[in-house]
Structures are given as structure tokens and as C-alpha cells.
């Protein structure tokens, strides 16, 4: 089965919004063993929509169309499909009744423009939208089934799960013969990783891809066919052997999600004292449901005065070593752990830039400490000076990885490679 996606909307085409629906759809399909082989974005122009529907209907088996089902003048998907099919738009009485009931139930007067959402191509199969007013539908044109969904993300996602995937599986033999495995790395550039892995003799049906999203490079293993899928475990073991410390997460988890899983399963607690990362460590964990089971409190102690007053850092430590130092960051970590009585504490202090650097401590110099019941681990790292955001995100990632390694019983301080010079 050949699956494609057509995304609609001037705002998407012009880059005014990021099309997160498309990325989510491709990833979700891959999880179900279905590969989306092409994606096209079209603006809100009737003739362009008609043209692309006709063109792609000769090439694909299934086309998911996203957007353009609302009540306004720029919602043109149903009209374009009727023109491509050469048939009239007709009112779907079931959906009209659903619309009227929805507005009555919510105590609102329905504007007549909403009736547009009940106008479907004559041969269309109505597809339920259980959480919105835009009616989905499916039409067969030439070789392809075109499946229409609203652009509102929560409506779109629910329809994909409840309507689209069952629709496809009822009509096509989906053997799940495509698999994707992801390995998240830290500290090595894309070219360095590619050079290292070039020596691997890839099994037939498997390709390696790379995706850069700082501070990480994601290695993607695509397997097509049952035989290729069976080789994934062996291939992953080879990659882990070659890359060693660079791999920090897998199974499509972010590093924060990896920490989250480990902390929840450990039953232990964590606190943070952040300076240069400005709450980024705590924020990434709080984004995940259930983090309150282990995250006691996150403090942002940005000024020297707050480090002394809140965390108990000695004034003489700051005078003798400076805020960005092993001595200071260790006292920060020990202080917050003692105050909150947590099992672990992470602390950061650094120079994120673009100003504030010196010859001894240039922009990108960051001190990180992990306090545990058994002692304190700390290191000073020198990061690329490309942007303030990069320094903060890399510092957060290294702090997370120190905690991850402690939880797994591995060496906490390691050399990641090209992200900078590390000092214990």
C-alpha cells in the first residue's frame, strides 16, 4: 500500500505556523508499520487543490488530506474534491443534524455558514468527527482513497486513531513490514557519527538516517521487510558498541523522558538548583505527567546573593573561585539536596553568553554537579558558543545524562566527544 499526505492551508505554506500534524502523522503511521511515502503542501487555492487531488490519485492507494473542512470561505477541501471527482456537493442530513444538536447542546445559535461543513461530495462516505464540527469523509478517485480530516490537532489525532487507521486496515493488507528504531546521541556531530558508522555492513532492507535537533543527533534505523526487521537488534548492538557513551536514550524517548522513566521506577526524589539553565531542567521534567512523584522542587538561583541566601553557598567560595566553578556548583547541589532532603540534586552554573566570558572562562563554560547520598559528582565543560539557547540546552542534557548514568550504575563523568573539553 502506498500512503501519501496532502496538507492544506496558506498559513502552512507561508511558514506562519509549523505543521506539527504532518510530523505526528508520519511518526504515528510508522509505529503502526505503515510508511508515508510522500507529503505535499497546498495553499487555499481551489484550482491547485483540484489539480493535486487528481494527480496524486493516480499514484497513491491512500491519501490523507488534512485541513480545509471548516465553515469559512478559505475552507475548500470538500468543494475541490467534488470538482476533481466531477460530482455535486450534497448536504449530509446526518451531519447537519449533528451540527444543530451540537450548537443547541452548547447553548449557542448556529450561524448559517456552519452548514457548509455538512456539504460533502455526492459519493463520499461520511467519517465521524467525535470532538468537532467539521465532518470528515472519504472518496474513491482513480486508484486512491482520499480521506479528509480537519486541521485542528486534537480533532485530527483522534480521527486518525479511531477512524483512519481502522479504515486503512479494513481495505489493505498491512503486514507491519516497516519498522523504525531511534537512538538519541549526545556530544558528537552528525558527520562524526556518520564516519564512525560507515564501517558497518548494513543488512539488506535497512538504511540509516540522521536528524539533528540540538543538543542531540538522532540516529534512525529504517527496516523494510520481515527479514530486515529481524536484524535490527543485532545492528543496534553494533552501533552501541561503536558509539559507547554517545547514546543516551532510545525507543523514541527524549532524554528527559528517559530520566522520567528511571526516576518513577526508582522511587527516589530529585531537586534542582539552576543558574545558567534558568529552570530548563525542571521545566523539561514538569512537561511530563507524573513528575510530581519524584521532583521535589526546582530553584533558579541566578544571582550570587541568592546562591548564598537560598542555598548556603559560602561567600568565600564565590570570592575565591567565582560563580562558575566546581566549588560553587558542588555547594549549590549539596545545599539544595540538604534543604529539601531529596535523594538527588542537580545544579548548574555557567556563562551562556553572548557576553560575560573571560580568557579563563569563555562563553560556553559551564559547571554541573550531581549530589547523591554517597557524594558529589561534578565537572566543568566548555560548550560551543553558537547561541545562548544552545549553551543552556546542552548543559541541561549533560546534567540529565549524569543523573541517568548514576541511576543505571554507570560511570557518571564521561567524555562525550566533540561537545567540548571535559574536566573532572
UniProtKB/Swiss-Prot annotation:
Protein name as catalogued:
CinA-like protein
Show the InterPro entries listed in the entry. Answer: CinA, CinA-like_C, CinA_C, Competence-induced_CinA, MoaB/Mog-like_dom_sf, MoaB/Mog_dom
UniProt lists the family membership as follows: Belongs to the CinA family.
PANTHER family on file: NICOTINAMIDE-NUCLEOTIDE AMIDOHYDROLASE PNCC, NMN AMIDOHYDROLASE-LIKE PROTEIN YFAY
Q: Quote the Gene3D superfamilies the UniProt record gives.
A: CinA-like (3.90.950.20), MoaB/Mog-like domain (3.40.980.10)
